[in-house]
């Protein structure tokens, strides 16, 4: 869901100016300039509770463009997803202060919105008056808690805080529609394509993961756009890593890093279990044609086991108490370009396996297009991490902050086992290892949970209700 930039009226606010940084990645110097006129600042929005800074993926509008209330202005990359940001007011995009690829703290100004066309020149002059027209522009310090546009009034001077300017790393460009999948495009790009009668299918987008943005549509409409897109693809198709180079974290990698460091403060322990999967494999083969996925089956089995052992679905946040979560929301780790995200299957114990599978496919598509909404990735109460598709037979997973347990699932492999009558037989078995918060969950709790999980997987009749 696109976010609206709200605008409280303030007596005066600060405005940073463009600054020049000759070396990518260095902090730019703050400058002080006064602003006079009815001009609003467009701030970097907070797209999630954990977001501290955002990266400009693309500007949907250009300087001087007319903006209507509710219209997409910019695509922002948060710590987990890309989102279209809309304006809450009519006006003109007077000046862009953070270019595409630039990073700005939450609450800092990224552009100016002029109420009338007559104020555009004044806004541009004020924005560029303190320095040359460099490639990057610095937002101000002390970001507020919410994303807003504020009116700029007379005669208040405030220094703008520095911001790190990161180079836009070239990444592989993918067609926005492959093999009948849905077209991944910004809302404004879709609207523009309809107006300009541009066919989006097969178009190579310049956004993340091939996402089509407005400039791609405009390029095609102007002629030669398809050839230009193909040329870009040829340039970036050959992967290459510059050995010895220092690469700054992406926004998502930074968020993962902070979460992993935070998890070090939680006392954890691990319990492993071997589960036979012959019956589950047979069920999967039987209902796979109906769109059921193995991930959905594992999530469903896990949710049913959690319903019988609510302490394993609990969480401790303050170190003094814990919560028996009212919903069983199974988060599943998914590797995406440039990071890791955990889409959440909410109320997995109550949703039928067919609906759960459809929901999972939808979440994966949105995750890979970086279009997940916060409630679709930050509401998990228990996490699954599955590396079985890579042939990994056993591994440990790190506990995500704010949850009680995470289960690492290995590959199902044929194993030689002793049968009940003393003979030698073959069974498909998988290894699971659960990492848990020992402040809340104890060894016996996990052992009982894993026994229940094994019984459900080895006799999966309850998974298809």
From Swiss-Prot:
Residues 39-114 form the Lipoyl-binding domain. Coiled coil: none annotated. Residues 123-148 are annotated as: Disordered. Its main location: plastid. Pfam families: 2-oxoacid_dh, Biotin_lipoyl, E3_binding. Residues 184-221 form the Peripheral subunit-binding (PSBD) domain. It is found in: Plastid, Chloroplast stroma. It is an enzyme of class 2 (transferase). GO terms for biological process: pyruvate decarboxylation to acetyl-CoA. Binds 1 lipoyl cofactor covalently. Its cofactor is (R)-lipoate. Residues 1-31 form a transit peptide. Keywords: Acyltransferase, Chloroplast, Lipoyl, Plastid, Transferase, Transit peptide. Gene3D superfamilies: 2.40.50.100, Chloramphenicol acetyltransferase-like domain, E3-binding domain. GO terms for molecular function: dihydrolipoyllysine-residue acetyltransferase activity; protein domain specific binding. One of its GO terms (cellular component) is nucleus. The modification N6-lipoyllysine is found at residue 80. It catalyses: N(6)-[(R)-dihydrolipoyl]-L-lysyl-[protein] + acetyl-CoA = N(6)-[(R)-S(8)-acetyldihydrolipoyl]-L-lysyl-[protein] + CoA. Its EC number is 2.3.1.12. Residues 136-148 have a biased composition (Low complexity). The pyruvate dehydrogenase complex catalyzes the overall conversion of pyruvate to acetyl-CoA and CO(2). It contains multiple copies of three enzymatic components: pyruvate dehydrogenase (E1), dihydrolipoamide acetyltransferase (E2) and lipoamide dehydrogenase (E3). Belongs to the 2-oxoacid dehydrogenase family. This is Dihydrolipoyllysine-residue acetyltransferase component 5 of pyruvate dehydrogenase complex, chloroplastic. It comes from Arabidopsis thaliana (Mouse-ear cress).
